Each structure stands twice: as C-alpha cells, then as structure tokens.
Curated annotation (Swiss-Prot):
GO molecular function: methyltransferase activity
Keywords, sorted A to Z: Cytoplasm, Methyltransferase, Nucleus, Transferase
EC number(s) on file: 2.1.1.-
Keyword Nuclease belongs to the record: no
Enzyme type, top EC level: transferase
Name by which UniProt lists this protein: Uncharacterized methyltransferase C1347.09
Signal sequence annotation: none
Amino acid sequence: MSDIVYANVSHYNKIEASKYDNPSTLAISKVISSKILQFEDNSETSLRHDLPKYDQDRLLLTSDDDLTNVNNFWKKSGMSILDFACGTGLISQHLFPYCKQIVGIDVSQDMVDVYNEKFRKMNIPKERACAYVLSLDDLDGNGDEPFSTEFDAVVCSMAYHHIKDLQEVTNKLSKLLKPNGRLFVADLIKGGDTFHGNLHPDEIAKLGVAHHGGFTPQSILNLFKNASLSNAEVIGKAQANVWVDEAKYQRSTQSKDAKTLDLANGEKLYEVKLQLMVISGIKT
C-alpha cells in the first residue's frame, strides 16, 4: 500500500465516515451529479450557501426530481456504473435511478460500510448497488472480482486531488470502460478556494492530499487524451459556497473575513467558496 493510499485510509476512518454526509457535501454531490447526468455543455452553476439542507431522506432515488434534460447517454437500458473512490455513496445515490447496477470501490472500510448500509436500508439488493474495499490494482480482470470489470460509465468525484499518479489512475479507469463508455471526473479548479491550501507539507501527507490546489481544466483534459479517451470536454462548472467547520476553514485558502453561521449547539461554521468542474471523455 502506497503512502498516499495509507494516508487516505487512515484519514477516512469510522469517525470521519460517520460525519462525512453533511449539508455541504450533500449539496455538492447533488450539483455534481446533475452535471454528470445532464451534460450541460460548459454551463456554470452557482451553488449558494442558502440551499436547502438536504438530509438523508431528501437524497434522490427517483429520476423525477428537479433534473431535466438528462442526456440520452443515461437513457440506455442495462447501464452499469463504477463509482471509483465512492466514499459514502453520495454520487451513487443520485446516479442509481439511471442504471441497472452500480458498483462502488474505496480503500476505506468505514466509508464502504456507510455506503452499503444506506442502500440496504432502502431495500436495494447488493446485486444492484454494492461497494467493496478495493483499489484499482485489485481490478486486474483475472476473474477474481465479485463483479464484471467492464462498465458503461466510470465516475470519480472529488478524489483526484487525493491521488498521486493521476495518469496511471486515468489509464486504468479508461481500461474498465466498455467501447463507447464514458469516464466522468469531478474535482476542484485550480485558483479557487480549497480546504487544503494552507497546510504544511507534513499535514498534507497525513491527509493523503496529493494535489491540494486543484487542477486546471486542461491538465485533466490532457490526462484523458493520454489515456486514449476521445471527445474529452468540460461538461459543467459550478461555484459552491458551502459551510465548513473551523478546522476545514483554517486549512482553506478562503480570506479570513468569511461569513459565519452560529449553530444552536454552539458550533460556528464558516463560508468557503469552491470552484468545481466535471470533465468527461469517451472510450472508442
């Protein structure tokens, strides 16, 4: 296990997994999922901090919410999806109505446990939605995997900035696609605020943050091109104004005169502005 993978496993432990789903991550996952589903052709969304505070009961498991113009790519029958670095399943929950099967993989057992518990509580069988503690190195196509290793779509949301060798990972994700399948990557845009920008290098290593400043769109497009993915393009951007706790605020590059919000339990939250993008490419 590499140092960066070990750091990610250590950071996303049971405590972190239990509190990972919060109003900010829920709202961000919703807007990223909408970009993935709609292919909004470079349009930009402003995700304001006064969005409704989505809770577990509000998460999409039907396709008739406020999403319109879902791309025809998602209307094919029998779709299979891999959610790489799936975490607690926030993206999977939004994409589930549009597929026959969704598989999540993550290096954190605690994150995977939360993912699977969610879907079991909704009486969705594991044959249709299930996460596994696996890394990309475990998916070698030798038949030992508990699922098919060919997918119509592979998604990776807010994980690339935790990955050291991005080209290697992009190449491997590309190989898991069926012909005409799509890879979707969502992450931070370089130059916007980030939760990791003010960390000392030792702290960055502890958190498993390999590219803490985010990415330029062109840098991700180049990764896709080198992985032989065609028609790579930015399919959506968003500015997300979200509330974070003091620890994340102190790690952020947000100016130190941010808006604050006092909670009833005495905790203070701070507003941080993130710039997000979603990029997609096709395996030909």
